[in-house]
Amino acid sequence: MWFSVNKNKKAAIWATGSYLPEKVLSNADLEKMVDTSDEWIVTRTGIKERRIAGPQEYTSLMGAIAAEKAIANAGLSKDQIDCIIFSTAAPDYIFPSSGALAQAHLGIEDVPTFDCQAACTGYLYGLSVAKAYVESGTYNHVLLIAADKLSSFVDYTDRNTCVLFGDGGAACVIGESRPGSLEINRLSLGADGKLGELLSLPAGGSRCPASKETLQSGKHFIAMEGKEVFKHAVRRMETAAKHSIALAGIQEEDIDWFVPHQANERIIDALAKRFEIDESRVFKSVHKYGNTAASSVGIALDELVHTESIKLDDYLLLVAFGGGLSWGAVVLKQV
């Protein structure tokens, strides 16, 4: 699935922002909590540490702080934002939406605000909606926020999952293309609900509401079949990436920067190898932050932008994969 509403109007990312909690949970810390080792974690994931939010650093707040940075970097005032999209898999509440809570924190009044749920692919799904809104002329300045406090749903007695996830938030402002922005080409998105149970949070919704049994059996924690997820992640992201490159009208060798979902260094390296992208052009932060879910790609993009390494006419390939199962890719162009 992809969006391209108005060929005469091109949406672009004007500016980015991100937020990461101060608390660091290292592999050495995890060695004291579960039967694991730094070598075991790094060999399988590439992760050395991750950030963990404090009790008052909830999802909506992390997203709102990232949003404040993005709005400032775009040179806009908050009252110029006319739509807010909040991508998250770990909302503050089932309702009200995390977007509404972030809106209140930002002091932005009366604009449409809603949550987008596509797990770790949420940043790209939200970007597709923002692009459509801008190119259709529905809104002028769309604020996309992606944040997750996954530590609230991690079982820190399960060595297979507790080593993977961290907390954080990212944001960007999308408007009509202007010099210095990152133009958004047509996105390639997909999902396969038949495989949803491979990566899920089993309880807490209407299908399996909270109960004494669900609490005792640990069904409020993230459940994942790692080997199966790995297999589908590489294949689906490769397909989406090829499709997005074709939609952008360029060749694989034209890609200047690869900005993948920061879930596992082995997955990142496998994808980079398939596209023959030089290691110096592959942006990695997974070793520092682990998998921050919907905010993952956004945090990576923000860090890359602030290195000032992106040059005029550079092409950036963003890819993501997450629960659903869901996946997506897009090519951005620096103009």
Curated annotation (Swiss-Prot):
NCBIfam families: fabH (TIGR00747), PRK09352.1 (NF006829)
InterPro entries according to UniProt: ACP_syn_III_C, ACP_syn_III_N, FabH, Thiolase-like
CDD domains (UniProt xref): KAS_III
Cellular component GO terms held in the UniProt record: cytoplasm
One Gene Ontology molecular-function label: 3-oxoacyl-[acyl-carrier-protein] synthase activity
Main function: Catalyzes the condensation reaction of fatty acid synthesis by the addition to an acyl acceptor of two carbons from malonyl-ACP. Catalyzes the first condensation reaction which initiates fatty acid synthesis and may therefore play a role in governing the total rate of fatty acid production. Possesses both acetoacetyl-ACP synthase and acetyl transacylase activities. Its substrate specificity determines the biosynthesis of branched-chain and/or straight-chain of fatty acids.
Keywords: Acyltransferase, Cytoplasm, Fatty acid biosynthesis, Fatty acid metabolism, Lipid biosynthesis, Lipid metabolism, Multifunctional enzyme, Transferase
Compartments reported by the entry: Cytoplasm
Swiss-Prot/TrEMBL GO biological process terms: fatty acid biosynthetic process; secondary metabolite biosynthetic process
The EC number(s) this enzyme carries: 2.3.1.180
Chain positions covered by the region annotation ACP-binding: 262-266
PANTHER family linked: 3-OXOACYL-[ACYL-CARRIER-PROTEIN] SYNTHASE 3, BETA-KETOACYL-[ACYL-CARRIER-PROTEIN] SYNTHASE III
Catalysed conversion reaction: malonyl-[ACP] + acetyl-CoA + H(+) = 3-oxobutanoyl-[ACP] + CO2 + CoA
Family: Belongs to the thiolase-like superfamily. FabH family.
UniProt feature coiled coil, ranges: none
Written domain comment of the UniProt record: The last Arg residue of the ACP-binding site is essential for the weak association between ACP/AcpP and FabH.
Subunit structure: Homodimer.
EC class name: transferase
Active site annotation, chain numbering: C120, H261, N291
Pathway assigned in UniProt: Lipid metabolism; fatty acid biosynthesis
Claim: Cell wall biogenesis/degradation is one of the keywords in the record: no
Source superkingdom: Bacteria
Name this polypeptide is given: Beta-ketoacyl-[acyl-carrier-protein] synthase III
